[in-house]
């Protein structure tokens, strides 16, 4: 969206992506076959790539819980999870969970073979049944494994990629979006970044940097009421406690709210914030007294703002990367990409 001249605030990282967080990797498995009414996939995020399981400190929040993110009971109790995050469609959660579990057993082979260990992967979803035959159960365990094995630390493809392939945002083509910010706190530079699977909102709500874009572009709307969701993953290399990470996750509501969404009743608006700092062994192998760094909450506001800015921009990036796609249910309509020329002109005037 920055390429269109949209003046987003803040300083992005070199990739303006969640992979600006050092070491974090993202992969996709994108499934498209119009003859089979297939437009779906899997997005994989690996906060700590490698073959040794380590705790990833995290916090979770649901603005509106009409959706699923597995593993969050333990995140809420223990403040961490282990392994990757995957995002897919609503009916693909079970298959992806099976695939991620198999991948973890194989990747962390020594851990699973030599200890009483269990996998509780984080798998989240949004509904792609307008552009994809979701009841055909196209997503299978091997697609999750393929996305995980494709993960890299480079640029992140946006729009109709991975789990975002069949998603609609504010009745424009939506999907995967990402953005990042660099901030300085206490003389240290940190990265805060987001990845979203944007499938939420109705056209009249869409607001971009304060402009009522949805009301100015009402053509080809698809819905009479909101029926989508958004998954937000926020990542940072700042050392944060699990409590602070939950507070960061809550700020995702502000990020999507800037885009116009009130968090509709039928929307699963579910957020996870994680930190790659405080690298260490699994708790059962750690000493009784843990020593971790933790950013003082009195200095955290800049990080909150960076998270809000990253999420706001990620949603717009998902929309701007869209293309026209034929609907499956109901058939015969077209989910339009946003008119980038009109969007560019709007901000040139403003």
Language model feature labels by segment:
Residues 1-350:
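Alpha/propeptide regions of enzymes that mature by internal proteolysis
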């Amino acid at each position: 969206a920055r390429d269109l001249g949209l003046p987003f605030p803040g300083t992005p990282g070199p990739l303006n992506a969640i992979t600006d967080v050092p070491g974090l990797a993202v992969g996709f498995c994108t499934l498209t076959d119009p003859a089979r009414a297939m437009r779906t996939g899997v997005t994989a995020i690996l906060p700590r790539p490698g073959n040794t399981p380590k705790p990833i400190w995290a916090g979770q929040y649901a603005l509106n819980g009409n959706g699923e993110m597995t593993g969050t009971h333990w995140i809420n109790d223990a403040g961490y999870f282990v392994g990757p995050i995957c995002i897919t469609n609503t009916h693909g959660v079970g298959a992806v969970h099976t695939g991620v579990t198999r991948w973890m057993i194989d990747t962390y082979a020594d851990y699973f073979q030599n200890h009483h260990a269990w996998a509780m992967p984080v798998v989240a979803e949004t509904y792609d049944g307008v552009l994809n035959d979701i009841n055909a159960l196209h997503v299978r365990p091997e697609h999750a494994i393929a996305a995980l094995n494709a993960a890299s630390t480079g640029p992140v493809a946006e729009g109709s990629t991975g789990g975002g392939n069949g998603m609609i945002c504010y009745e424009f083509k939506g999907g995967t979006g990402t953005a990042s910010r660099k901030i300085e706190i206490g003389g240290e530079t940190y990265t805060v970044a987001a990845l979203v699977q944007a499938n939420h909102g109705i056209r009249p709500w869409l607001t971009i940097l304060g402009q009522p874009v949805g009301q100015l572009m009402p053509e080809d709307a698809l819905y009479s009421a909101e029926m989508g969701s958004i998954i937000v993953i926020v990542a940072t290399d700042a050392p944060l406690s699990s409590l602070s990470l939950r507070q960061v996750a809550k700020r995702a509501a502000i990020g999507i709210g800037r885009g116009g969404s009130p968090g509709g009743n039928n929307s699963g608006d579910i957020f996870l914030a994680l930190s790659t700092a405080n690298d260490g062994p699994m708790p059962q192998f750690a000493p009784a007294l843990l020593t971790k760094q933790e950013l003082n909450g009195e200095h955290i506001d800049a990080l909150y703002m960076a998270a809000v800015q990253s999420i706001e921009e990620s949603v717009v990036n998902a929309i701007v990367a869209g293309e026209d796609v034929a609907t499956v249910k109901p058939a015969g309509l077209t989910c339009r990409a946003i008119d980038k020329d009109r969007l560019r002109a709007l901000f040139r005037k403003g």
